[in-house]
């Protein structure tokens, strides 16, 4: 990871730490302008049935709960971003209740279907049905007050620039069920997930933004049987139309990550791998000819213990000492 992109990545990790509920209140300097975030699960449960949660937005912010959110500039804000994340089985709905920005004067309010940081996208261009430009919704050009945008996965992002103090906007964020989640960023460093593609020709990536131990318990691809590590020269699964691969890297975009293992054969049992990368991705490629299914469990990896244990692949992301 480049030094320029490291602060952005650390900010994402800090946001996700808050969402996990490690701290009920956390104060972020500079980037979040000393914002206090109340985003953990205990706070969600405190909201009574039917009550709408409301709060102000900061220039750099992140949301994991439903509610109505307002940004009002107290000074020119030129480079702002709002990260939205839901549970793996959720789509995000964004409704524009009130918009008071100067589009002609250079203000911006754009929604991106996914996350994008320093040009790296999730889902990657290989895993999303739309082109990069089609994934943007420009409220200044395409949207009206009352219009609605829906994400294609459990994450979305809003970019905005508001130059005039007192100007801003109000959004309502809702979640709706996604019966067959495809591309996912996990809020947690620990969990279990089953990815299913029912006769659909698409690629799906599950991203875990932590070093983790991955355990794959079950894989059904409609053919064969084996797990093979990618060691040069790899045989790989390139000729298979249906396979699962494990990726690791230091950025957001799965297409720019290291291929660590191919799984192109069905198996039932348990296969484990330790991945010492900042970001770990389980990616399923499906031809649409089968009902493909993979179940896996992930837990945060202790970097002090990862060397010389099992099938550690730490060297794929961190040079050896």
From Swiss-Prot:
Presence of the UniProt keyword Glycoprotein in the record: yes
Gene Ontology process terms (BP): hormone-mediated signaling pathway; negative regulation of corticotropin secretion
InterPro entries in UniProt: CRF-bd, CRF-BP_C, CRF-BP_N, Sperma_CUB_dom_sf
GO cellular component assignments: extracellular space
Keywords from the UniProt entry: Disulfide bond, Glycoprotein, Secreted, Signal
This protein's name: Corticotropin-releasing factor-binding protein
Cystine pairings recorded for this chain: 59-80, 103-140, 182-204, 237-264, 277-317
Cited function: Binds CRF and inactivates it. May prevent inappropriate pituitary-adrenal stimulation in pregnancy.
SUPFAM superfamilies for the chain: Spermadhesin, CUB domain
Subcellular locations according to the entry: Secreted
Glycan-modified residues: 203
Gene Ontology MF terms: corticotropin-releasing hormone binding
Family: Belongs to the CRF-binding protein family.
Signal sequence residues: 1-21
């Amino acid at each position: 990871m480049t030094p320029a992109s490291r602060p952005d990545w650390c900010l994402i990790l800090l946001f996700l730490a808050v969402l996990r509920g490690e701290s009920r209140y956390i104060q972020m300097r500079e980037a979040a302008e000393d914002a206090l975030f109340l985003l953990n699960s205990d706070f969600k449960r405190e909201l009574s049935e039917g009550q709408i949660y409301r709060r102000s937005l900061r220039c750099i912010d992140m949301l994991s709960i439903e509610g109505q959110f307002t940004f009002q500039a107290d000074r020119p804000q030129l480079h702002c971003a709002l990260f939205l994340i839901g549970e793996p089985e959720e789509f995000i709905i964004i409704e524009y209740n009130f918009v008071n920005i100067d589009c002609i004067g250079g203000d911006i309010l754009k929604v991106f279907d996914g996350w994008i940081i320093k040009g790296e996208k999730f889902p990657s261009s290989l895993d999303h049905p739309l082109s990069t430009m089609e994934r943007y919704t420009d409220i200044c050009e395409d949207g009206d007050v009352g219009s609605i945008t829906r994400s294609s996965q459990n994450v979305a992002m809003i970019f905005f620039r508001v130059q005039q103090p007192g100007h801003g906007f109000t959004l309502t964020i809702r979640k709706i069920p996604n019966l067959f989640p495809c591309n996912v960023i996990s809020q947690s460093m620990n969990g279990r997930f089953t990815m299913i593609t029912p006769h659909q020709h698409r690629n799906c990536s599950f991203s875990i933004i932590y070093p983790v131990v991955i355990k794959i318990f079950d894989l059904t691809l409609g053919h064969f049987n084996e797990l093979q590590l990618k060691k040069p020269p790899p045989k790989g699964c390139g000729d298979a139309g249906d396979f699962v691969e494990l990726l690791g890297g230091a950025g957001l975009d799965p297409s720019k990550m290291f291929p660590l293992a191919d799984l192109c054969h069905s198996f039932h049992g348990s296969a484990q791998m330790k991945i010492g990368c900042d970001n770990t991705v389980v990616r399923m490629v499906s031809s649409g000819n089968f009902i493909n299914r993979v179940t896996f469990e992930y837990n945060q990896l202790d970097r002090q213990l990862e060397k010389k244990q099992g099938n550690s692949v730490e060297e794929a992301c961190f040079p050896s000492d």
